[in-house]
């Protein structure tokens, strides 16, 4: 089910959702097309029924050398909300985020007003310039620790007790835009290969099993003809007849680079997906 469809001026990418008191907060990359260049922002929209959404509100600054984007998810810690996100610097002529791309968190008390981004030092106590290019963060509250997943050498992951001090743990081959949920003592890693939304499973982050790749009836979606990608799965049992919702975006770059629309699907078993809530 479509949420926001791309226009000449804007496209919508990289969804991440959080549910609080019956309200869905949908964070995403908003791409603005101007005659001079594209600008990337993190924006938010809200809904209580998956159908009616508020107008997007931009949360980050307009700066082509930062291009805050790709919100990963929100977690709550010590009564504060933390949203992880990336920078995606594109100097004149660069198509993709350059080697200065890094990952950050923003903190909030109310999910609406956010402090300035703070660098996620997921490689430990090394300088920012030595961290290497990294994008697409995702934070998992794993009970006695936090795990930060990010796109570098496939998917890399680091652990922390306090969201401030991190230890790098390793990496494995994987697509981008990782989202991780834990089911029955098993971690399910949703990720994006060249097309589709892939699911990998692991119990120990050492051995990984390929589960399936979802295409969500792409052939019937002209707005997603180039790619189905960036799946974000969340438990919606508190507000929906279905146990899960998966927000995602579909690429159609006929008009311009990074052209995309946001949509959502619903499931009880993570295998069969429905278009209507």
Per-segment meaning from a language model:
Residues 1-277:
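Carbohydrate-active catalytic/glycan-binding domains of CAZyme proteins
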């Amino acid at each position: 089910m479509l949420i926001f469809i791309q226009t000449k001026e804007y496209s919508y990418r990289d969804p991440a959702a959080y549910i609080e008191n019956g309200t869905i907060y949908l964070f995403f990359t908003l791409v603005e097309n101007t005659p001079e260049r594209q600008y990337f922002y993190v924006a938010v929209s809200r809904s209580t029924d998956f159908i009616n959404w508020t107008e997007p509100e931009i949360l980050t600054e307009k700066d082509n050398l930062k291009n805050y984007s790709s919100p990963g998810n929100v977690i709550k810690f010590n009564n504060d909300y933390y949203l992880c996100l990336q920078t995606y610097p594109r100097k004149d002529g660069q198509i993709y985020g350059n080697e200065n791309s890094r990952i950050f968190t923003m903190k909030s008390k109310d999910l609406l007003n956010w402090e300035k981004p703070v660098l996620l030092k997921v490689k430990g106590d090394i300088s920012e310039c030595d961290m290497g290019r990294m994008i697409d963060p995702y934070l998992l509250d794993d009970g006695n620790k936090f795990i930060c997943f990010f796109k570098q050498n496939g998917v890399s992951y680091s652990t922390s007790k306090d969201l401030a001090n991190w230890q790098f743990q390793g990496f494995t081959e994987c697509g981008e835009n990782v989202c991780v949920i834990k089911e029955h003592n098993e971690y399910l890693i949703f990720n994006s290969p060249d097309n589709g939304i892939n699911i990998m499973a692991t119990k120990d982050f050492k051995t990984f099993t390929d589960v399936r790749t979802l295409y969500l009836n792409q052939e019937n979606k002209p707005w997603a003809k180039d790619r189905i990608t960036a799946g974000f799965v969340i438990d919606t049992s508190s507000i929906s007849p279905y146990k899960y919702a998966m927000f995602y975006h579909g690429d159609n770059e006929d008009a311009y680079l990074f052209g995309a629309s946001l949509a959502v699907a619903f499931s009880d078993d993570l295998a069969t997906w429905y278009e209507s809530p």
